Amino acid sequence: MKEYQVYLERARSRQQDFLYPLIFREYIYGLAYSQNFNRSIFVENLGYDNKYSLLIVKRLITRMYQQNHLIISANDSNKNPFLGYNKNFYSQIISEGFAIVVEIPFFLELSSSLEEAEIIKSYKNLRSIHSIFPFLEDKLTHLNYVSDIRIPYPIHLEILVQILRYWVKDAPFFHLLRLFLYHFCNWNSFITTKKSISTFSKSNPRLFLFLYNFYVCEYESIFLFLRNKSSHLRLKSFSVFFERIFFYAKREHLVEVFAKDFSYTLTFFKDPLIHYVRYQGKCILASKNAPFLMNKWKHYFIHLWQGFFDVWSQPRTININQLSEHSFQLLGYFLNVRLNRSVVRSQMLQNTFLIEIVSKKLDIIVPIIPLIRSLAKAKFCNVLGHPISKPVWADSSDFDIIDRFLRICRNLSHYYNGSSKKKSLYQIKYILRLSCIKTLACKHKSTVRAFLKRSGSEELLEEFFTEEEEILSLIFPRDSSTLHRLNRNRIWYLDILFSNDLVNDE
């Protein structure tokens, strides 16, 4: 009890009412524009859609200052006095400003937490989403059961705002945030539909992801707390999640609710070989023991979502499967544990024995069908995987067209170089190569064969297959056997911070 009271007091001492004035500072919106402009896009760098104008920001801040624009009129609900006439453009600017402002205190708290845990030097590698796969390679081969869980969306955005209020005590800021979401997301309805949430997430991705991540961290904090109290393997790096208001009361209520199913103490959860991995809205729970314990955690998740977040979830939506008989999808890969059986002859004196040895190996496979579906959606091929031209790029120069296709191939190869088998990756690169050739032929109003014969582009287009080997040769010795072995083995790059549309994780 005392240790968590100390946590709460320390959290309260850091909470200050300073977020509201920042929303009226011009440099906040300039910072939001700069971060969006410099963000590297996975498919191609298209830049920022909306032009940044200091005059527009000044006009918007003036509107927000005026009291008559902050009054909600119930009799005239069709008009939008808060955002004015340019609703979509102003809402985009305001949402990015909200996202920048609200991230500031949590970034400072995260930095201090990392310094206390003495992992600040390796934080850049820990940020990589590919750092999950080396962990899975080490752990999954020793486990037997896995549960593939899709985290449900909250039924109302007010739940997300309430979760954020546990961390920051700034009433004016939250009034302004609610006012903005009220006009933009139509909070008149009791339940926010999945379609409206999807629209909000696409038009305001940064603010939505920030609110949604806090919703996920709220339930994860209780899960990690129970996990740490039931295991001798403490997760000190997640201590930042535990500093929140009413956390101890939630924990006591949770134990009381599950006393009937989980016994009267938390010692029932003792399992040193249960592992939890999450990315975005999908999490993987794996264990070595019998599925009885996995069922307990399954019901814990369901009751937690229903009791604390008013999110309805059915038990049948969470399945528990044997790893040797089930494959699951994570971060654009298909993962399954394959059993390798081998027979060893053993001789003892005059007797000879045949011993069967079973070993496990984690297969990480490139999903060819979802990738072809993504390429077809981007108009690089049809639904059967046959390459087609990209006429919208025909106005660019030959060098720019080839550079665009090379960038996509380079990023795909960079992302999927950890796969067990490279055949699917080579098929995708082959589709992009032919699509590039057809696009160039379409630009020059010629057939593919005539264009290649006339321009002699074979050597230039060989970069689709040779560039990766040249990069590896700069890192490793120029030995053909070494490069051949590297092409067969998995290589994880710890500089990949996010996935994109071509990496379909549905």
Swiss-Prot record:
Protein keywords: Chloroplast, mRNA processing, Plastid, RNA-binding, tRNA processing
InterPro entries documented for this protein: Domain_X, Maturase_MatK, Maturase_MatK_N
Matching Pfam families: Intron_maturas2, MatK_N
Keyword Transcription: no
GO CC annotations on file: chloroplast
GO terms of molecular function: RNA binding
Keyword GTP-binding applies: no
GO biological process, one term: mRNA processing
Subcellular location: Plastid, Chloroplast
Family: Belongs to the intron maturase 2 family. MatK subfamily.
Function statement: Usually encoded in the trnK tRNA gene intron. Probably assists in splicing its own and other chloroplast group II introns.
Protein name (Swiss-Prot/TrEMBL): Maturase K
